Design a protein with these regions (language model features):
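Short amphipathic alpha-helix that is part of the acyltransferase structural core
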Residues: 1-25, 42, 138-140, 150-172
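A short helix-loop-beta-strand connector motif used in the catalytic cores of GNAT acetyltransferases and
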Residues: 30-40, 134
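Conserved beta-strand in the GNAT
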Residues: 40, 46-54, 59-66
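Short strand-loop junctions, especially beta-strand C-caps/beta-turns
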Residues: 65, 70, 96-100
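Conserved acetyl-CoA-binding loop-helix of GNAT-fold acetyltransferases
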Residues: 67, 73-87
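Conserved GNAT acetyl-CoA-binding A-motif
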Residues: 88-104, 109
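Conserved catalytic-core motifs of GNAT/GCN5-like acyltransferases
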Residues: 96, 109, 113-133
Length: 172
């Protein structure tokens, strides 16, 4: 699994700003959690895409969706998200995106909207994932339609406590 994990982590590093991913050791620690999963997409023995997610009682949370740079635009991300939506079996799926400030972030939001997700405009901050980074302003997208502000706060409390490992009321 170590070689596969190294490949997964390389895709994460190549796809996300460092403040949006954990350290190598921090990411590897997640593999021992019962609520954390990584869905992979491989072709001819090559890892081309990953989707890291959590399964909680009432919802699933996609933390990372990424494809190898050479495999982007091939529909792999769509297949991975569709697999998670199937796994959710009618439960809410949420994920975080950067605010729509440029063409890349707007395109990413449109990608998720094509898969049925709704952009929620409420304020949301990702707590620091490692000691060398700060908070990151993000927005939540949801698979079962728009969230009320109260619903988003309830999801944020779970993310704060179980994903970011901070006080549930952090930034609420």
């Amino acid at each position: 699994m170590n070689s596969l994990f190294d490949s997964v982590y390389k895709i994460m590093v190549d796809s996300f700003p460092m403040e949006e991913i954990r350290s190598y050791e921090g990411q590897k620690e997640l593999l021992s959690r019962e609520d954390y999963y990584i869905e992979t997409y491989e072709q001819e023995g090559q890892l081309l895409g990953i989707c890291a997610y959590y399964i909680f009682d009432d919802f699933l949370y996609i933390e990372n969706l990424a494809c190898k740079p050479s495999a982007r635009g091939l529909g792999i991300g769509t297949k991975l998200v569709q697999a998670i939506l199937k796994e959710a079996n009618g439960r809410q799926v949420i994920l975080e995106v950067e605010p729509p400030t440029d063409e890349i972030t707007k395109r990413r939001i449109r990608f998720y909207e094509r898969l049925g997700f709704t952009f929620n405009p409420y304020e949301h901050f990702q707590a620091p994932l490692n000691p060398t980074t700060g908070m990151v302003e993000l927005k939540i997208m949801s698979s079962l339609g728009a969230l009320t502000e109260e619903q988003q706060q309830a999801y944020r409390r779970v993310l704060n406590e179980k994903v970011y490992l901070v006080d549930p009321n952090f930034m609420i």
